Amino acid sequence: MKMKKTNIKMHVKRGETVQIISGREKGKIGKIIKVLPKSSQVIIDNLNIATKHLKAQKEGDSGQIIRIEKPIHSSNVIQYKLDSNTSIKDRV
């Protein structure tokens, strides 16, 4: 049986400015760089940063420690207007 393809609607889109309303980054403002609709998550530029340790791939190489942006659930963000410094309260 073939699975039916469904469109998952999100209230935010890539490139929009949002404010985080819940979690350890609460109150911070950032721009969405990627939307993950299947898991209802978004990745915001320079927010929700995590440290990742990478193992050495070759014998002579050394490992790395990199910092990456982790996804945050879309219900924890709200659209934000930079020109008037206010958040848009209604959710779609």
UniProtKB/Swiss-Prot annotation:
One of its GO terms (cellular component) is ribosome. The keyword Translocase does not apply. Belongs to the universal ribosomal protein uL24 family. GO terms for molecular function: rRNA binding; structural constituent of ribosome. Keywords: Chloroplast, Plastid, Ribonucleoprotein, Ribosomal protein, RNA-binding, rRNA-binding. NCBIfam families: rplX_bact. Gene3D superfamilies: 2.30.30.30. The keyword rRNA-binding applies. The gene is rpl24. Its main location: plastid. CDD domains: KOW_RPL26 (cd06089). Pfam families: KOW, ribosomal_L24. One of two assembly initiator proteins, it binds directly to the 5'-end of the 23S rRNA, where it nucleates assembly of the 50S subunit. Part of the 50S ribosomal subunit. It comes from Gracilaria tenuistipitata var. liui. One of its GO terms (biological process) is translation. This is Large ribosomal subunit protein uL24c. InterPro entries: KOW, Rib_uL2_dom2, Ribosomal_uL24, Ribosomal_uL24_KOW, Translation_prot_SH3-like_sf. It comes from the Eukaryota. It is found in: Plastid, Chloroplast.
